C-alpha cells in the first residue's frame, strides 16, 4: 500500500540524449516549424488529458525553435495501447511524447506479456504531478463514509480503466486489506467516461488521484442530492487540507482510525 501512482511522461528511447546534446542554435534549427506529438493513453476530460493539454499549451514556448504541441488521445486497456505504441511505433526523433499510466512499468516487472515494451529503454523526462490515491462514492448509492462502505451488505460498483491503474488496483487492495465489497467494473477509457457512468448510476464510485478528482470531478463534488460525489478515503500519511477529515489508508489498515468520518 505504499505505492503512489504518478502521471508519467515517457518518450521513445534516446529523445532525452538528443535534446540535451543539441547546442542552442542546432535546437532552434531542428524544432523551428516542427510539431511535437503528445499521445495520451486515456480519454479526454480526465487528469492525464488535462495535464497533458496544460503542459502542451506552454511547453512549446520553452523549447528552442518554439515547436507546435499537438495532443492526441489513444485510449484502450488503461493506457496500455498508447504505451505499446510509444515503444514500437513512435519515432525516436525528439517529436513524439507518450503519456500513460506509470503503473504499467510494474506490470512489466511482474512479467505481464501484454506489456510489449522495455521500460528501461524509454527516456523518462518528467511528471506534472504525483497522484494521491483517493476513493469517492456517489450519494445515489446511499453511502456517505468509509464506515457506511464497510457496513454495506451488497457489492459496490467501482469504475476502472483496467488492470494496473489506480482505479483498478486500489479497490482490489482494499477488498483484501480492510474487507470492502468493491466490484471493479473495468473497460472505461478514462476519467471522463467513468464520471458519466457515475452520473448515470451505472457505477457507485471510483478510486483515482485526488489531484485529478478535485479538478475533473469538481462539479460533482460541489453538487447536492444524488448527484453529489463524496470522498471517503485517501492515501496519505498526513491529512489533505481540503479534505482534512477523511480517513487515511495507512491508519485504517493499521487499525488506528476510528472511522468516524
Name the predicted role of every residue range:
Residues 57-69:
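Signal peptide-proximal N-terminal region
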Residues 38-52, 75-78, 160-166:
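Extracytoplasmic "Venus flytrap"
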Residues 98-104, 190-191, 201, 207-216, ...:
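Beta->alpha turn/N-cap motifs
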Residues 130, 216-261:
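C-terminal lobe and pocket-closing loops
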Residues 25, 61-63, 85-96, 104-204, ...:
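Hinge/capping helix and adjacent helix->loop/strand transition within the periplasmic-binding protein
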Residues 8-18:
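Bacterial N-terminal signal peptides
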Residues 34-43, 69-71, 96-97, 155-160:
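Short, well-ordered beta-strand elements
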Residues 50, 67-84:
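Early extracytoplasmic/lumenal segment of secretory-pathway proteins
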